[in-house]
Structure formats: C-alpha cells, structure tokens
Amino acid sequence: MKNLGKWLLTSLLICSMPVKAALDIIITEGVDAARPIAVIPFVWQGTGPMPSQISDVVMSDLARSGTFSPADELSLPQRGISTLAQFNASAWMAQPAEAVVMGSIKPYGGDKYLVSFELIDLVKAQLQSDSMSTKDLVIDSRETVISAAQFRQYGHRISDVVYEKLTGIRGAFLTRVAYVVVNHGEKSPYKLMIADYDGYNEQMLLRSPEPLMSPSWSPDGQSLAYVSFENRKAEVFVQNIYTQQRTKITSFDGINGAPVFSPDGKKLAVTLSKDGQPEVYVVDIATKAIKRVTNHYAIDTEPSWFPDGKSLLITSERGGRPQLYRVFLDSGKISRLTFEGEWNLGGSISPDGRSIIFVNRINGKFNIARMDLETRFMQVLTSTRLDESPSVAPNGTMVIYGTTYQGKQVLAAVSMDGRFKARLPAGQGEVKSPSWSPFL
C-alpha cells in the first residue's frame, strides 16, 4: 500500500480531465490463447445510479493485457455477490476460469465511495477438501475510499493487483503513453499528447505549426523530452507534464534529435550533427555539459540506454547498412548486435536488459522484432505495414509502436511473444512516435 499515496496524487492531477478514450483498442489476435478469468460486476450498495462501474475497467484491462480472457457476464454461475461469504464454490465447479474478481461500491459521504474487492482462487476452490478453510481461497482482498473521479484510475489499480498476483509480473495498467498527433490542413497541425495506456484522459502538452517528434519519458514519469521544430530548426526540450515548465537542452546547427533519458534521469542521450556527421552524445540536463559517445564517418543515431546506465544501444551505418550496436560509455568499446535481415534500427531495450526490440527489414518489409541478447535468437513479432518507433511497457510484457493501416499512421501493440496483437486507431488525425511511460 506504500504506493497508494503516490497513485492518489497522480490521479488527482488528471481527474479533472474528461473521461474519453482518444485511442480505441481493437484486439486483432491472441484472444483464444489467453487465460480464462471471471470478473463479477461490482455490487452497488447505494441508492440511485452508480457513478460508473469499476469492474468494466478491470475486465477491459485484463482483456487488453493479452494474458487473460474475462468470461462473459451471462455465463457466470453467480452474480450480485461481492464477498467470500456469498461465494458458493459448488456453483463454480464447472466454470473454466482460474480466478474470480468480485467487489462492491458503497457511498461514504460527500463525493466519496468505499470500494472493496476480493480475488478468489477458483482452481483451489474447485479442488478444495473438506478440511480447507474458505479463507484459504482469498488471494487478495482490499478496500479504499476514493472520489467518483478516481473510479477509472482505481480500476486500473485493481487490475495491477490481479495481474501481479496471478502472473508474478507487475501490472502496467496505471501507466501512460505519449505520442504525436498530426492533423494536416490545420494551422497548427502537430500536437504532443499524453493519455492513459488505454487512451482515456488525453492531455495536450504542446501544439505547433512545425513538426514535433521523438517524445521520451523521464524515469520518474514527471517529464518528457522531445524534438521541436517550432523555431524553424530542430531543438531538444524537456517539459514537466504537470507544471508545463520547459527547458531547452540542445539547439545546435543541424540535427538535434532522438533524446532519451538516462536511468537516473540526470542525462539525455541525443543525436547531434554539430561536428559533421550525425553522432551520439550524452548531455547533462542540469549543466548542459556534452560528452561525445561515437566518432565515425558513418551515421550513428537513435540511442537507447541499457538499464545499468553504462552503455547505449544505437543504430549505426558503419557496416554499410543500418544495424544495432552496443557502445560502452567508459571505454568507447562498440560491438554489433544484429545480423539478420537487410536493416535493423530504432532499438529499445526490455526493462530487464535481456532483450532488444527494434524495426527489422526483410524483403523490403518493416516489422517489429525482438532479439534475446544471450542466445541471439530473433523473432519477428508483427505482420503490419511500415512499422516504426517501438516502445516497451515498463513491465516488459507489451510493445507499442507506430504503423500504417488503411493508408493512415496509427498506433498498434504486440505482446513480447508476438501472440497478442491490437490496433489503436485514433478518432482524428494520424498518430505516431509512441512512448510508454514508466510505472506511475
């Protein structure tokens, strides 16, 4: 519960925004292989209409994770229950699910509500002996007091708990995504946006008549680094998403691009061409001191930090075509990582540092691929068109990326094993350059 205060502060900062999904999530593959789970609609214990149904958020989260497949409500043997005391294990003997989520919502005075939920081990319930206590069936049980405006955010919190308890992996439902929306024909067509991972609570950080690109989150989730051409040249900025305060980090002649925060949040790795060819540099955010990392006549670009902060993944053409390399900051030692396919570029690193995710070109097709750094096994994850800009969820289970669908730039998502796929179409404009936030 130590993160609850931080979560409540974050939700209060965005709860005044309209509840609207700017990005839909359309699941296209992977439902059949998901693990079955039952989510009983939470019981309303007040008079009048319920503000909103938190369990709907939980069901959607679990389905979108690609890991779980919530059962249809009409197929559930019990509905209208919210506690273990009301749970009838005998009624659930034939239900194909591994767990049951149930809960209640009760007015608590003013605009406050007491929300309770329980996570029941259905497999254990179906196998239980006479000597087993019903309390042994409870995997987790919690309650908290929130406002109506916090219902959706707390639904994500419940989903995080359920996901972690059943998989051992931290849930990433209380995260956000930054992206660029382009509406051609408007006076200021470029918008830097952030939204909850599921497209709700969209917020515009910046609008410009000139291109915006390459947003990247700070490790604390408080700021974004990005490239802006608002002054008719490429410049790198860092902007606090809550105070809106902006700081210009680099504004050299030529390329100022591909900013990405170091794991400690104190530096940016960037691509600059101030000394000739595009090269990778590290900039101290506080002092603006610059250290050159690469020095080669070929193009070096698109840096990404390994979790230990001691090395970078970069795209380099020093071998004749774009490939991914690892460069160590202290020694300058550089080694090539990718060899399969015509091109490999735009790399990201999994949170555990064991895999890289990147754009792979084979036979002229650009798709998202993953490579295990120990075995060097590469797997192409997607079959969409003109894929670009992969960004990994902070728990390492999903990748969000840009692609083209029906002639329009959209976002899409794929699980790290390639089994689950989803498309995230926007209502208006083209969407590109996604960046998944850290845990918030």
Curated annotation (Swiss-Prot):
InterPro entries: 6-blade_b-propeller_TolB-like (IPR011042), PD40 (IPR011659), Tol-Pal_TolB (IPR014167), TolB_N (IPR007195). Keywords: Cell cycle, Cell division, Periplasm, Signal. It comes from the Bacteria. It is found in: Periplasm. Its main location: periplasm. SUPFAM superfamilies: TolB, N-terminal domain (SSF52964), Tricorn protease N-terminal domain (SSF69304). GO terms for biological process: cell division; protein import. The keyword Signal applies. Residues 1-21 form the signal peptide. The Tol-Pal system is composed of five core proteins: the inner membrane proteins TolA, TolQ and TolR, the periplasmic protein TolB and the outer membrane protein Pal. They form a network linking the inner and outer membranes and the peptidoglycan layer. PANTHER family: PROTEIN TOLB, PROTEIN TOLB HOMOLOG. Part of the Tol-Pal system, which plays a role in outer membrane invagination during cell division and is important for maintaining outer membrane integrity. This is Tol-Pal system protein TolB. It comes from Shewanella pealeana (strain ATCC 700345 / ANG-SQ1).
